[in-house]
């Protein structure tokens, strides 16, 4: 069986409604690149009130949407979302909820990670 080697990279996955979390994501990318780390910046599409995707699978502009393969192949993960009433934004939760089989198969095991957020409220 042939093993496919992938380039090591830090996956910076974020959702941003107003741009604050996007700015943090790019600041993290700048810092990682200064340390000679390869970086992939990805986002997730918006969802409707019924928590279903409301945007095309390929964005017309801006960051590329994250795929499960991006998560599988990353060497580390930085995850960012605005905080809304003490929780992450619905589009990020919707995406993460779709990755249950990655968790069940330990696809992210031994990969360092961090989270970042921005909020305008106390919680």
Language model region names:
Residues 1-108:
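N-terminal beta1-alpha1-beta2 submodule of the flavodoxin-like/Rossmannoid cofactor-binding fold
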């Amino acid at each position: 069986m042939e093993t496919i080697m992938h380039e090591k990279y830090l996956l910076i996955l974020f959702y941003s409604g107003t741009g604050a979390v996007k700015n943090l994501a790019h600041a993290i990318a700048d810092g990682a690149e200064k340390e000679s780390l390869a970086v992939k910046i990805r986002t997730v599409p918006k969802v409707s009130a019924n928590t279903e995707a409301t945007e095309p699978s390929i964005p017309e502009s801006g960051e590329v949407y994250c795929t499960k393969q991006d998560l599988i192949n990353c060497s580390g993960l930085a995850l960012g979302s605005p905080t809304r009433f003490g929780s992450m934004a619905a589009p990020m939760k919707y995406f993460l909820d779709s990755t249950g089989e990655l968790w069940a198969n330990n696809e992210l095991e031994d990969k360092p990670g961090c989270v970042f957020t921005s909020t305008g409220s106390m919680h």
